[in-house]
Amino acid sequence: LDVAVDGPTVGIDMESPLDNIVGFERAPKTDAEKKAVEDAVAVLRAADKLFVVDPAANCKLGPVDLRSGALGLGNPDPAEPVGHADLDATFSFNCTNASAAKFIDVNLFGAFKGLRQIDSQIASAQGQFKRQLKRPAGAQASQPVRLSWGK
């Protein structure tokens, strides 16, 4: 998960094996798999529920770009090896004060049961940071995890 705070925008780039998102790494075959893909795409498109940007930045969700060759989404990376099915996503938030953002509450673990950990890099006016988020245990697993940076 790469986060860039740049001008009036908070941009989030995500790359994940499809298995983490829908439970398999290929094009859907059964009706149940097709439904799982539809549900996952709907959740990802509602990115302002998955990523709650620090209210101090006053952000609104902008464009969401989802790409996956196996799922027939967007324009997937032609350099991606055949048979390696992943999902690439770009989420843009338009903000009135993006530089005030010091955290994002990430709800990916609650939305996608296959995720165990998220490696993140943040680039902001406060500097560059690396963070690792791990799935909370037990009842906390559905709670958001705060990705914070800066002072």
Which residues are covered by each model-predicted region?
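N-terminal soluble domains immediately following signal/targeting peptides that reside
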Residues: 1-151
